[in-house]
Amino acid sequence: RSFAASAYSSIIYEGYDFSCVLIDATGQLVAQSGEDHPFHVIPVAWSVKGLLEKGTPIDDSLVYLHNDPYTGGTHLNDVAIVYPVFEAGELVFFIVLRAHWADIGGMTPGSLSGAAREILQEGLRFNHVPVPKSGIAPVMDLIFDNVRVTREAKADFHAAIGTCRVAERRLRAVLAKYGVATVQAAAAGVLAAAERRMRGAISTVPDGCYRFTSYLDGRDHDRFPLQVDVAL
């Protein structure tokens, strides 16, 4: 709600095209809002794991911008702010806000074109670009100079940073009340419970080989198949 109340773009304050999640220090999704979008939330863990796999030390003074579809993004307009939270010098959680930017550069206004033949035509790609938590940096000037609705982009970006600060404040209140170890144990318990339920559901499926085929929308001219084969 903080983001919807402070953003400038109608796609945010009317369309609610954004999601906010909490990720643990290993890159596991542990919490999300009931209003979040699955197509934002599901890839977020890969956005964070990609940052961790780089091996670069996570800096408490930085956030990391990510939208690369090859490493956990969706389409380029959906930009994730990966906001690390440290306690007593230890990385404990990541707050991640993924939101649709009205324009991210590229060949057409809005950065969405059926005529694009390569990703470079779709706009700017961010693969964990470090930015100070203030949101003020030369790299942001470069980014804003290469999108079409600069005023909205700046306002939405700073609204997103502010929302992450609100989330951090609320998270720190929980950590102060219950302790880091207890909160981390609770998060691990949620993941373990989810695994038990999923394994229980899978165990009811008879052993065998299963196949399902579907097709991408809008490809009637060649009907490119997407096939999944599963053996139990």
Predicted regions mapped to residue ranges:
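Gly/Pro-rich turn-and-neighbor structural signature
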Residues: A4, Y8-S10, Y16-H66, L175-A231
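N-terminal leader/propeptide and maturation segments of large enzyme subunits in energy/redox metabolism
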Residues: R125-M198
